[in-house]
Amino acid sequence: MYNKTLRIATRKSPLALKQTKYVQKKILSLYPDLNIKLVPIVTHGDNILNKSLSKIGGKGLFIKELELALLENKADIAIHSMKDLPVKITKELCLVSICKRGNALDSLVSNNYQSINQLPKGAIVGTSSLRRQCQLITYRPDLIISPLRGNIETRIAKLDQGKYDAIILATEGLNRLRLKNRITQIIPAELSLPSCGQGAIGIQSRLHDKKVLFFLSRLNHINTFIEINAERAFCRKLESGCQIPIGSYAILKKNKIWLRGLVGSPNGKIILKGERIGCYNTGEKMGYSLADELLKNGAKNILNNLHIKQSYCI
């Protein structure tokens, strides 16, 4: 049994704290006598709200300080939204467990319209996700996409102030904050393929901390882990971050895994899609194979062009 106080690093946002308390409850259900201390941290990404993530370095900005807390032994584990965790894990750290996934899909939130199809021509839709932007423009090129940053409550407040006709958010984030009533449409994956790992919570720790690894491995949800492992393999092969419009979504059912992947241009003019179906234990191989297929079909040119443009902005 782990006989020390378990220190949990977490972002300070309402959603991050809600997710951390969810994990805390799971841990205490297994080890009721364990003493737990939360270590709230403000990340670099939390402080920069006037620029899109694609222009300031990507989702890794939300985890860097949490990982530093682990490396400096100021925390024992860190809680992440899996969609924010880069596909290449920092050396000396590892992903201990992934909790059971919630709803992985995106949702439309609007005060006046019930679906994307109902949005009028010229409607302003708020999102700073290049992945969502790319797919939405392809489906509805007559809409206006406007940047939207901040935590979920802040984004909804901007919608309510009339700055947007609709906004797009992660469904599970709304569910966790008990804002399910604000969802007007859960967007099908065929229209908006989710981000890698979306809807799941990951637990990260030091690679050498064997005792923590052992007792927290019990929180791992194997089906979710298999699904997200396939998604992350796809993105890892593409060396992707949120600076690039990429989606990946795997579903495991009856020992078969169905993996879908997408690479697009930010303006929505080019979208490449593919899928694989295979045995549950071939998810990682499927992810690499699907990425290779899209790279050969034109994704390599899209990614190269985006990397060149980004290098000019640094």
Curated annotation (Swiss-Prot):
GO biological-process terms attached to the record: protoporphyrinogen IX biosynthetic process
Annotated organism of origin: Buchnera aphidicola subsp. Acyrthosiphon pisum (strain APS) (Acyrthosiphon pisum symbiotic bacterium)
Catalysed transformations (reactions): 4 porphobilinogen + H2O = hydroxymethylbilane + 4 NH4(+)
Family: Belongs to the HMBS family.
General function of this protein: Tetrapolymerization of the monopyrrole PBG into the hydroxymethylbilane pre-uroporphyrinogen in several discrete steps.
Cofactor note: Binds 1 dipyrromethane group covalently.
Coiled coil (residue ranges): none
EC number(s) stated in the UniProt entry for this protein: 2.5.1.61
UniProt subunit comment: Monomer.
Cofactor requirement: dipyrromethane
Gene3D superfamilies xrefs: Periplasmic binding protein-like II (3.40.190.10), Porphobilinogen deaminase, C-terminal domain (3.30.160.40)
GO cellular component, one term: cytoplasm
Miscellaneous remark of the record: The porphobilinogen subunits are added to the dipyrromethane group.
Protein name in the entry: Porphobilinogen deaminase
Keywords: Porphyrin biosynthesis, Transferase
Top class in the EC scheme: transferase
Keyword Transferase among record annotations: yes
MF (Gene Ontology): hydroxymethylbilane synthase activity
Family annotation (Pfam families): Porphobil_deam, Porphobil_deamC
Gene responsible for this protein: hemC
Pathway field: Porphyrin-containing compound metabolism; protoporphyrin-IX biosynthesis; coproporphyrinogen-III from 5-aminolevulinate: step 2/4
Keyword Transport annotated: no
